[in-house]
Amino acid sequence: MWKRMTAKAEGLYIADTKSFVTKQMDKLDFDYGGIPGDLHFGLTKKAGAREPMFSRGTEIFNRRQISIVSIEECNEIALKMGVPRILPEWLGANVAVSGMPDLTSLKEGSRIIFPSGAALLCEGENDPCIQPGEVIQSYYPDQPKLASAFVRHALGIRGIVCIVERPGAVYTGDEIEVHSYQRKVKRKAERV
């Protein structure tokens, strides 16, 4: 069973330098592998700290072609951390949406469809790491220990990672359809 929701693309971003911090764009072209020119582009990637089951450097499938955050969750993280704001680009996001205050809880396998027909497949939560925390710290140098606070406060609200299921152009302001797969849980009968 599928549940349909809507959201709006408030911002589009690309990491086209060696830094994971993204810069704002009006349009992006999604291709198999992600966003051409983006730091995370590719069908495969080298295994790192997030894939401890593989030797570091092993070539594996790239589940993080696109990163999405919600404006509502960014605001919630900022509130928890006691800072005025957290921008999507500080988190390395490629897409910032509004209208989905629970974006991070979107189930794996959910689809995000743009007006052009471009489609993303949700691969799950983007676990918080220290790098965005260090960027946030650089904007608020008078508040100590924000880097580590980010990891703690962003858990469960940091956004999601996706792969491109269907290429296409996306634009700031696009109305997005989200199709979330709602699994029915079957319980085994208890033995008496």
From Swiss-Prot:
InterPro entries: MoCF_Sase_C (IPR005302), MOSC_domain (IPR052716), Pyrv_Knase-like_insert_dom_sf (IPR011037). Residues 15-179 form the MOSC domain. Gene3D superfamilies: PK beta-barrel domain-like. GO terms for molecular function: catalytic activity; molybdenum ion binding; pyridoxal phosphate binding. PANTHER family: METAL-SULFUR CLUSTER BIOSYNTHESIS PROTEINS YUAD-RELATED (PTHR36930), MOSC DOMAIN-CONTAINING PROTEIN (PTHR36930:SF1). This is Putative metal-sulfur cluster biosynthesis proteins YuaD. The lineage of its organism: Bacteria, Bacillati, Bacillota, Bacilli, Bacillales.
